[in-house]
Design a protein with these regions (language model features):
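Walker A/P-loop
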Residues: 63
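Canonical P-loop GTPase G-domain recognition
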Residues: 191, 197-250
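Nucleotide-state-sensitive switch-loop elements of NTP-binding domains
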Residues: 5-52, 57-60, 71-155, 165-168
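Long, well-ordered amphipathic alpha-helical subdomains in the mid-to-C-terminal portions
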Residues: 228, 239-308
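Inter-motif core of Ras-like GTPase G domains
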Residues: 139, 155-173, 183-193
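Conserved ATPase-coupling elements of RecA-like P-loop NTPase cores
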Residues: 126, 153-159, 177-179, 201-205
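Conserved nucleotide-binding/hydrolysis micro-motifs of P-loop NTPases
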Residues: 87-90, 119-120, 151-153, 173-176, ...
């Protein structure tokens, strides 16, 4: 994309042009240097849209819940963006891309924008590409952006650092509730959502989790909420959305967005450092090092010195 065309695309994106958004997202996805594109956008636009992260284990019903949230928010005339990060094969890189199928009923709605992409094997649920695309979509005139991450469960921390509100979705009978608590999840989520409340074991799972949360000491006096619902429970899902809205509004006043921006800056620094290492073929040259004869620290110090 040429410079003038890029500037025009950014201007059109800022003006609310969906085609320009789609075009810019594709350009970011395929670019060798996506971070520079995101920076060009952020030089001319601010992140104004709250990002809601939805993570959880496989089979928890994340996509179905988001689909229900979209229906409720659309009845309120809200504009919604969705990034559905699907699991990808670590060998082939192929993505299941099943999440978008569950949301197909909204595909003809011009106030709903859904983007599916592969995780590229990122265990934390948020690949580098999805991180950048989330930031791009947050400058568009959506009222909410939902980012559904890979449901692997080893690390939900990626999305919680980017999102203004993070939901851990659990399903009854999957045996994952205690494991979730052991994983330090209290430190990184705002809402634990027991899905599929129409199942008989859901009540037991809910009370079990509630007992764990009540006994646990959440960091920094963080108020973690636990709720129970299912995709067809419009009343409860509306209550959940109201809760999210209230927390996001409060956290904005308390400066949580600043924390998110600081993380954004750190990510940019990491990406730029990595690019320098790649461009200067420093990583490639490591293959020539004799690690048996040199201290690793010596090699690292020399690389840092060469970069100065």
């Amino acid at each position: 994309m040429k410079s003038m065309e890029l500037q025009q695309t950014i201007e059109d994106l800022k003006a609310g042009d969906r085609l320009a958004l789609s075009k810019f997202l594709t350009h970011v996805e395929t670019s060798d240097n996506p971070i520079e594109l995101v920076l060009k956008l952020y030089n001319k636009a601010d992140r104004t849209t709250p990002i809601i992260g939805v993570t959880g284990f496989p089979g928890a019903g994340k996509s179905s819940l988001i689909n229900s949230f979209i229906s409720i928010l659309r009845s309120q005339e809200k504009k919604i963006g969705v990034i559905a990060v699907d699991p990808s094969s670590l060998i082939s890189g192929g993505s299941l891309l099943g999440d978008r199928t569950r949301m197909d009923q909204h595909s003809s709605d011009d106030k709903v924008f859904i983007r599916s992409l592969s995780s590229n094997g990122a265990l934390g649920g948020l690949s580098q590409t999805s991180f950048f695309l989330s930031l791009v979509m947050a400058t568009f005139d959506f009222d909410y952006i939902f980012v559904e991450t890979v449901g692997i469960g080893q690390s939900e921390s990626d999305i919680t650092k980017l999102a203004d509100f993070s939901i851990l979705t659990l399903a009854p009978g999957l045996g994952d509730s205690i494991q979730a608590m052991k994983g330090g999840v209290l430190e990184i989520v705002d809402l634990i959502l027991v899905n599929k409340s129409d199942k008989p074991e859901s009540s037991q799972t809910f009370h079990q989790l509630k007992s764990i949360i009540d006994m646990a000491q959440a960091p920094d006096n963080k108020n973690i909420t636990i709720m129970i619902t299912n995709e067809k429970d419009c009343k409860e899902n509306t209550r959940i959305l109201t809760h999210i809205e209230n927390v996001v509004e409060k956290s904005t006043k308390l400066g949580r967005k600043k924390e998110s921006r600081l993380w954004f800056v750190r990510q940019i620094l990491y990406e730029k450092i990595e690019k320098i290492l790649v461009d200067q073929k420093i990583i490639e040259k490591l293959n020539e090092e004799n690690f048996n004869e040199k201290e690793i620290n010596e090699i690292v110090e020399r690389i840092i010195k060469d970069l100065r």
